Structure formats: C-alpha cells, structure tokens
Amino acid sequence: MKCVVNLQNMEPDTDERSLRHRVRERDKKVLRDTYKLINTENSPSKRLNMGYTTIYPTGSTTGHTHDDLEEVYFVISGEGIMVVGEEEFEIKTGDGLYVPPGVFHTTYQTGNLPLVVLWVTGRVD
C-alpha cells in the first residue's frame, strides 16, 4: 500500500506553541509550526512517523522524551542549538542527528532565519 502526502496539502498542529494559535490569541512570541506528514493514523506503518518543523526566530520546541521511540533529525535550513540529554551542541543546515529512546531533547532556533527540520521517529520494541 502506498502512502504519499504533500506538505502543501497539510495543516500544521494548532497547539499553544504553534504560529496559528499565537496569532489567534494575539500572542507576540511565535515559537514553531509542526506538520505530521506520515504517521500510524494516516499510513499503514505501525512504527514510523515523519514530520516537518519550522522554529521561528527566538523560538524553541518544548523539551520532551519519547520512551518508546527513537528519533532522527535532518536540518533543512537555519541554525540552532540542540540539547540531547546532558549534551548541548550547535546545529545547522545539512546536519543529521540521532536521539535515543527515553532521552530528553529540545531545540532552540538561534539565527536570523527560521530553523527547519525534518524528523522521523521509529517505535522500538
């Protein structure tokens, strides 16, 4: 079974950190938009999720862990700081990184342009 989605046909998440929520609430600080492209609800996959996140200037993701998921990121454009466990390091266009299951991680945008990342999570046994 084939599952093809296009970002241009998707709506971003609308949680409290999203651009749409903050504009609607007239909040001045915009953090990020996330699009969940492929997931276990819209595809036959039982283990994989793929998404696209834009973190706007001065924005960040909410720090979190995935106890049953490992995650990889690819930085499409921009620059920022990634915190994975106890480590903190700079990321930029072209970087790929891995986050093991159960490890805290968060991302901060640091440049003049939005930080855009593609991410994939996979369920572990």
Predicted regions, residues:
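Short beta-strand His + acidic residue motifs that chelate non-heme Fe in jelly-roll/DSBH
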Residues: 62-64, 82-83, 99, 105-112
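A short, N-terminal "cap"/entry segment at the start of jelly-roll beta-barrel domains
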Residues: 1-48, 62
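Short, conserved beta-strand element in jelly-roll/cupin
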Residues: 53-57, 65-82
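A short hydrophobic beta-strand segment most commonly corresponding to one strand
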Residues: 53, 98, 113-125
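Short acidic-glycine-tyrosine-enriched beta hairpin
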Residues: 86-101
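Short, charged/polar surface micro-motifs in flexible loops or helix N-caps
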Residues: 43-46, 55-60, 79, 123
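Short strand-connecting beta-turns/loops that link adjacent beta-strands
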Residues: 42-43, 68, 112-113
